[in-house]
Design a protein with these regions (language model features):
Chain B
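Short hydrophobic alpha-helices and adjacent helix-cap/hinge residues
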Residues: 2-184
């Protein structure tokens, strides 16, 4: 297979982007004469803090970033972080397997990674937990939307100041200050027939220096129902009869039907932000229970079809206390202590005998994975503003963290809940239950002249689980001409192996040995041009990813070698896998953005586009191939018009993703048997492009002061998501279906909501 | 060392509530643009714009903001189309401030952080002068500083005290007033 078509598509879209750039500059040049547009242009500058841990404009920041305002979230009917990313951000995209969204950036996405290649911050507090490295980017994020002041989406490697997981970039969710959330607020919203959400919040100032904002919310979703075509799982190895695919159901071997009960989620969430003088306290807590009607990633035997008690449950809470002070005009000091707790459960009932091999038992088995992690840490930071005018600033910091992780798997009789055996897959292995992680960073910024700014820094991260990792970044920002800025950026980032990857084991998984951190290097050149109230960004990038951790299927020779070394576990299947550093990715492409306002600042628009050519080399497929699920062309467009303070705002947003291979497309299923066609699919399954449109109307309810509404309609043109339902081969590796069935898409959605503000 | 410094700083008197929310460089650019939308600016200023950057003695936040604003304004070719000079000054009292503004023909007064308690008296002292007062903090504007900057949802916002603007003979054009949050 060749991928020349991909290179041509990058070329065509590059030509289109350059054309749009030219048109926009021309249009902007005309707009510059309008009175007030020069002031408007400055007011439209994003103010960011994430890229360099200092207050600066987006143009001056040493990275490409998008700032998404609370106003944008409301105007365009956004309900969750993944929707904000898809409809409003540049360079980042999510895909929805009906469970937790996968997230990727600039043409790279790792399916089923629990979001561990992008760092999620809430008010600067890192949320990714150590067991899986996971963070939630959908409804499970745990912050009521009305509490969000703005989102900063920084793309490209960001470990220089933040350490592990910032490979795709960093997303910082900034919550509102009391002045912007003044009073008490009550919100009720429903996606008609599918979900509802209620939330309340308040923001109060006490005197000149003290303030409190808090919000709580509850989201519940059930449905819609999806119908799945027949998936033939074949004959059960144990019973000799067709596999049972429904709870205590008949032995048909066929997994199919309409799932009415197994697609739901429930999210209670609460956040609090308190500040008094130099002290700031952030607290957050959320639980996220969800069930998906199918397994997005391959299981040898399916969970019982439409069984409502198969679910995942995450619970998380965090506390972050920060104190900042400026003892002299040169020095800023900040100290922060933080603590997090996270636990997860996965409950999974299976009636197939081959997954429930316990003598004398005929009841279904209940698989119960549990994992917990807690971590506490402190970060100390000093900023030296040597000339007191921010032209020469040294930032130095250290972050020390202690991590504790535990996990296990139990198998129970689903009827009596009696345990079938001792816990397996126990993490941590051995007695070393605590990990100490040290991160230290240094960043130097220098503005030798008003038209040039330089930023160089590096962070070192060390832990007993891996060799020290250094993540440097160099950036130059050149104000090349009036309104024009050129940025040149080189950055590296890493991801530490999660505890799950490093230590988990079961009958199908051999414990990993000596996993190294994943690495990425990236170079980027970005041109930003402001002309009047319009802004254009065009950037090209290239990145190299090495040592990515993936599952390697053991070969026959490896089984023989393990046996010879007496390392072969007593219970290990003949299709067992092992986490290894086996995958590399090479990619290049461009990001383009065109945004601004017109009609006296009443109309706002933006167009974001990303195109990439990505080549992945992995253990399974061997030769280079595009990464699964990841669109190589994606973007969004939006326009909104404000009719006036007492009238509605109408917003139309569109999200586009190009054709892409489905998850598991390039996996083999029996690589150790030479005469079998090793791929699961007779033809590689590609999902057609998707276009999603959302129309939103919002504004104050006439006659009732304090009451406002928001209503949106959402339509997706394609009914296919890039995930495979079931399996195209049966339990005996016989191909039963020539084509793949793609996961469904909830194509039409309507949402209405009301908010009442009790103003002080 | 950092731990010790952080601990000792617990006694520091500066409050984060008076921290800058909008980058100084952007404040300087907005100030320069806004000046050109004041109909009386050229008449008041003459041939050269003189900006006084007022800082509070012994206040590190204030000192740094003043120094940074001086550098930022110096890099801007013109303010309201005119050449310009900037000068740092420490606040003594309101009467002395008014005298300095008169004596040095100051046309823009930039008030660095640290003056939340003095803004009222400052307002009374300069009310009779034809002078654009600019606050580094949003809190200053409702209390009598003509122009200020706030951060709302990751974007800067201009604040204008229109009553005080009229008193100080500042006449912003409607094109920019509609972009601001107006206090009357």
């Amino acid at each position: 297979m060749t991928f020349g078509r991909g290179r041509r598509h990058v070329g065509r879209t590059l030509v289109f982007a350059v054309h749009v750039f030219g048109l926009s500059v021309s249009a902007s040049a005309r707009a510059v004469d309008e009175s007030g547009t020069d002031v408007q242009a400055l007011l439209d500058e994003n103010i960011v803090t994430t890229a360099s841990k200092s207050l600066e404009t987006g143009t001056a920041a040493p990275a490409t970033s998008t700032s998404i305002t609370a106003e944008d979230l409301r105007r365009y009917g956004i309900h969750s972080l993944d929707e904000a990313i898809n409809f409003l951000s540049l360079g980042v995209v999510t895909a929805n397997p009906l469970r937790d969204p996968d997230i990727g950036s600039r043409g790279v996405l790792v399916t089923g990674d629990h979001g561990n290649h992008i760092l999620l911050l809430i008010n600067g507090h890192a949320v990714n937990e150590p067991l899986y490295g996971s963070a939630q980017f959908g409804r499970g994020m745990g912050v009521p939307l009305e509490m969000i002041d703005h989102l900063e989406v920084v793309i490209g490697p960001g470990s220089v100041l933040y350490g592990s997981s910032a490979m795709f970039g960093v997303i910082n969710v900034i919550t509102k200050r009391a002045k912007d959330f003044a009073g008490t607020h009550v919100i009720a919203e429903t996606e008609v027939g599918k979900s509802y959400r209620v939330a309340g919040g308040a923001g109060y100032q006490f005197g000149h220096e003290t303030e409190l904002t808090l919000a709580i919310g509850y989201y519940a979703q059930k449905g819609p129902s999806f119908t799945f075509g027949p998936q033939n799982f074949g004959v059960d190895d144990v019973s000799g009869a067709p596999i049972v695919t429904t709870y205590k159901g008949p032995a048909t071997g066929i997994w199919s039907g309409t799932a009415h009960n197994s697609y739901y989620s429930y999210v209670p969430e609460a956040v609090l932000r308190f500040s008094s003088g130099n002290l700031e306290v952030n607290l957050r807590g959320a639980t996220y229970k969800r069930s998906a009607p199918y397994a997005a990633y391959l299981s040898p035997v399916p969970g019982d079809f439409d069984y409502p008690d198969n679910y995942d449950l995450d619970r998380s809470a965090s506390a972050d206390i920060a104190y900042r002070v400026r003892p002299t005009a040169v020095l800023d000091l900040a100290a922060r202590v933080y603590g997090d707790t996270f636990d997860t459960q996965r409950i999974y009932t299976v009636s197939a005998s081959s997954n429930c091999i316990y003598r004398g038992n005929t009841s279904p088995c209940l698989y119960h994975w549990t994992g917990t992690s807690q971590w506490v840490g402190t970060e100390l930071q000093g900023s030296f503003n040597w000339l007191q005018d921010s032209s020469l600033v040294t930032l130095v910091g250290a972050d020390v963290r202690v991590v504790s992780v535990q996990a296990k798997q139990d198998v129970q009789n689903a009827d009596t809940l009696a345990y079938h055996e001792s816990s397996t897959n126990v993490i941590p292995i051995g007695n070393d239950k605590v990990e100490e992680v040290l991160g230290a960073y240094l960043q130097q910024t220098w503005t030798p002249a008003p038209f040039i700014a330089l930023n160089a820094g590096a962070r070192i991260d060390a832990s007993e689980r891996y060799d020290p990792v250094i993540s440097p970044r160099f950036a130059a920002n050149l104000a090349a001409w009036r309104g024009g800025t050129i940025k040149l950026i080189y950055a590296e980032a890493f991801r530490a192996p999660s505890w799950n990857e490093a230590q988990s084991s079961n009958v199908n998984l051999l414990t990993a040995e000596s996993l190294r951190p994943e690495r990425v290097r990236s170079v980027e050149a970005v041109l930003e041009q402001k002309l009047g109230a319009q802004r254009v960004l065009f950037g090209v990038f290239r990145s190299w990813w090495t040592d990515l951790i993936d599952l390697h299927r053991l070969t026959t020779q490896e089984y023989i070698d393990l046996a010879a070394q007496e390392k072969l576990p007593s219970l290990l299947s003949f299709s067992a896998q092992q986490y290894r550093n086996i995958t590399s990715i090479d990619n290049f492409g461009f990001n383009a953005r065109f945004e601004g306002s017109f009609l006296g600042n009443k109309a706002h628009y933006a167009l974001n586009a990303t195109s990439a050519f990505t080549s992945r080399v992995d253990d399974e497929y061997g030769a280079s191939h595009p990464p699964a699920v990841t669109p190589q062309m994606f973007g969004n467009a939006r326009i909104a018009y404000e009719f006036g303070e007492r009238y509605p705002v109408i917003g139309l947003a569109a999200h586009f993703v190009g054709k892409r291979p489905a998850a598991r497309t390039f996996e083999k299923y029996v690589p150790q048997i030479a005469h079998f066609d090793p791929y699961r699919f007779a033809k590689f399954p590609y999902v057609e492009p998707q276009l999603e449109l959302r129309l939103t109307v919002s504004g104050p309810v006439p006659v009732v002061p304090g009451l406002s509404y928001r209503a949106s309609l959402d339509y997706a043109f394609s009914d296919e998501a890039p995930y495979i339902v079931g399996r195209p081969v049966d339990n005996h590796n016989v191909r039963t279906s020539p084509t793949a069935q793609f996961a469904p898409v909830d194509r039409f959605r309507g949402t209405v909501g009301l908010q009442y503000d009790f103003l002080p | 060392m950092l731990v010790g410094a952080a601990t000792s700083s617990l006694l520091a008197r500066r409050a984060a509530a008076e921290s800058i929310a909008v980058p100084i460089r952007l404040q300087a650019e907005l100030l320069a643009k806004m000046a050109s939308y004041d109909r009386n600016f050229q008449a008041r200023t003459g041939e050269r714009v003189r900006t006084l950057l007022l800082t509070k003695l012994g206040d590190p936040e204030s000192a740094r903001a003043g120094a940074e604003m001086k550098t930022a304004l110096a890099s801007i070719p013109s303010i309201g189309g005119l050449p310009h000079d900037e000068e740092l000054a420490s606040y003594a009292d309101a009467a002395a401030l008014a005298d300095i503004c008169r004596a040095r023909k100051v046309s823009i007064l930039y008030v660095a952080p640290g003056f939340s308690q003095q803004v009222d008296t400052m307002r009374e002292a300069v009310s009779e002068l034809s002078l654009l007062t600019v606050g580094s903090l949003a809190d200053y504007v409702p209390n009598g500083i003509v122009l200020g900057f706030d951060l709302v949802s990751g974007r800067s916002k201009l604040l204008v005290n229109l009553t005080q603007a009229r008193r100080q003979q500042i006449d912003f054009r409607a094109e920019v007033l509609k972009l601001t949050r107006v206090y009357e």
